[in-house]
């Protein structure tokens, strides 16, 4: 029954669906995720407050006890679960991609499909099951997202490693995240979409030594991985440990590693530290061929209760475990953090061999058998390595770093501690979200640090006077709105980066982005700097970040004729606090809100629009009202008239929707991106883009447009636009949500 196609079920959710009839239609489902409808906790539940009541040290004590409390249903290798839990944490956080900010461990998504069933995550279902008694004990005070990562941290500590710290604060989600593009392949280990000459992979469940993945590319030394994915195969976290497509070539593997880890925001030193540090402990598992392994959790029968990959080889566990298909124990003390990994890497010469499952791996030449067995104390093994381990020796740059680490153990330990901390926290966002007694004091550049204002926050009367001063500068309100939007809309809900706080729009690289209209941006910033200077003559201070947002608020208020909320307290980042290379990934290729850019051969403009809206955590109604409002406010990045369908530009009217829904207007394509409209009744000519016309062509978006385009729609349109505007302006204000600022400071007279 579990394998029957959904469309054969004649109950709700079954049958042929819209996506079957029209697979290319614009999907809005990613704008309806992670809402109160799916969250079992009360609407007023605050995870941050619950975490603060957690017995943190008691939890860590319980986790340390678990490390050596081997369970019969899933015995611990070497009597210690450390290696398993390090892998669990690594594979939770390691899905992060800097290009779009998605993935990572911040939502606890390893519990859900597809991640819970990826070939690279075989046996991690058992790791989470081992954790359940502890999760059960502490309940809502610790999320799965936090617990999985903290467990990896505690595992390292219990094996003798000093970590850099840990921050909690990751609330759980309750459904599979549909917003992340993991690749276009439809088979496990396939990569024919992410690479132009890739392989189709295989449909069977199981481990990563699938035969289809070993056909190999003709261009493994030159191929380019599509953006924004970071893994070399569908269903892998990183790269194929046997080598590119199973070809045991350490140099070619290094190329894949460098691509993948750089897309995780890791440089070469961090990459070497993570691989060497992570492979210092634990082992891989490949006791027998993968045809012994049953279906993954999502395809397993109901009686398996969420567990997958049942193994018919021997006992199916312990010494008979099949996970990756590789059988490697790196060091002589796999439950202790040592320098053995790097020592052996350079001490021995390595020859290619096969695991019991038939996977490519390497064994030390002329070495004695001194590596312990995971379960039989009478057995010993020769040192073994993965192809990707040897990359750290045979890639010239990785080799330099690896040798330096070998010669400087304390440097290696510090590098691994920092890289591991970064891996676990890269998608956490601002430090104001970080919770717990182990938050490190040192500020790190990748945090995108923003100084906390060292002066009293402006009050209501200050806000009123500043708004008047801003509007008196003579800068067009549309330019003020464009600048405020440009600053705030860089926010990414995936990794909580970007946003108006910090005013990085005035710094490189954002001040050079075409979408930000650099010449106009400089004009607006100059005017606001003047307002700031005049205001501070009184002895008070205001951040330019606050002024940028306040300028937009003042302009929207003037256009709408109603008060617009404003929450002060932003700080100003410096260029030295800004990682230029990292921030380049926030530059939009297209921004429908400002009618900038266009689609590609694979992605339409409107698909990019929905993707951007999801990053801004917008609902479909919020997306609709913002686009319609920004058009009539003249927020197009280049001042074009596309979609500015109003006789009162600069006024917050519902004219965009009224005009769009006029049945007398017919449209013709100019180039597939821009369209010309003619009203047969008035003769009026219009122009619009795909980002405009989609609100009339897409049935669900049109339904929303009809609400705002109705005769009684103006009041609701204004109310909803102001609310959505305020939401975007404050997406990165986790400091306010956490009550770090005194509430009395925020009750400005607006």
Swiss-Prot record:
Cofactor(s) for this UniProt protein: heme b
SUPFAM superfamilies: Heme-dependent peroxidases
Gene3D superfamilies: 1.10.520.10, Peroxidase, domain 2 (1.10.420.10)
Cross-link (Tryptophyl-tyrosyl-methioninium (Trp-Tyr) (with M-264)): 90-238
Comp. bias intervals (Basic and acidic residues): 200-218
Residue numbers annotated as active site: 91 (proton acceptor)
CDD domains, sorted: catalase_peroxidase_1, catalase_peroxidase_2
Site (Transition state stabilizer): 87
Pfam families per UniProt: peroxidase (PF00141)
Enzyme Commission (EC) number: 1.11.1.21
Record-level GO BP terms: cellular response to hydrogen peroxide; hydrogen peroxide catabolic process
Top-level EC class: oxidoreductase
Subunit structure: Homodimer or homotetramer. Predominantly homodimeric.
Job description of the protein: Bifunctional enzyme with both catalase and broad-spectrum peroxidase activity.
Family classification: Belongs to the peroxidase family. Peroxidase/catalase subfamily.
Designated name of the protein: Catalase-peroxidase 1
Gene: katG1
